[in-house]
From Swiss-Prot:
Primary gene name: rplD
The family this protein is said to belong to: Belongs to the universal ribosomal protein uL4 family.
One Pfam family recorded for the sequence: Ribosomal_L4
Stored InterPro entries: Ribosomal_uL4, Ribosomal_uL4-like, Ribosomal_uL4_dom_sf
Region entry Disordered, spans: 44-79
Entry protein name: Large ribosomal subunit protein uL4
Keyword Ribonucleoprotein listed: yes
Amino acid sequence: MEVNVYNIKGEDTGRKVTLNESIFGIEPNDHAIYLDVKQFMANQRQGTHKSKERSEISGSTRKIGRQKGGGGARRGDMNSPVLVGGGRVFGPKPRDYYFKLNKKVKTLARKSALSYKAQDNAIVVVEDFNFEAPKTKVFVEMTKNLKVSDKKLLVVLPEANKNVYLSARNIEGANVQTISGLNTYRVLNAGVVVLTESSLKAIDNILI
């Protein structure tokens, strides 16, 4: 599959690049995508949730009423889970949600996500670029020139670029990632994926 190469002014350079079929043209594997996204989301969790059990509630331990003869249910102290303000039974406890995923599955998931974007014609390739200084205005102009300003945007760079990152940081729906940090969730969450020529070459080395 061939796509045109544009510059940041939105002009067609007259050159074309070929998207690797083994990355951008495979039959997407939805289960691999599910597993990779599940792992990504789980690993973002802090896992600090906590509720108090009966023994952790600060309150009197005096028995509310007599055990028998009251005509109602048996009750212990005010910390009982059946009463408002009492402890919680089997409530959440701090835990680590982190889990690992096989490298082959993660690679397949990223290939599948990129293939979905290629099928939707949602991949734009641009010449390598750099900003002289962090300027949000310059980044916005680039998105308008490429006609992607109205979409969620994922810009993939070959390596970290502070000026580009800072220029996009304050723009809603815009995300800048390096090729090493590319993940399935970010790709699927974007309406359009913008790849530089160097990023496209680097993807071949990482995902093949």
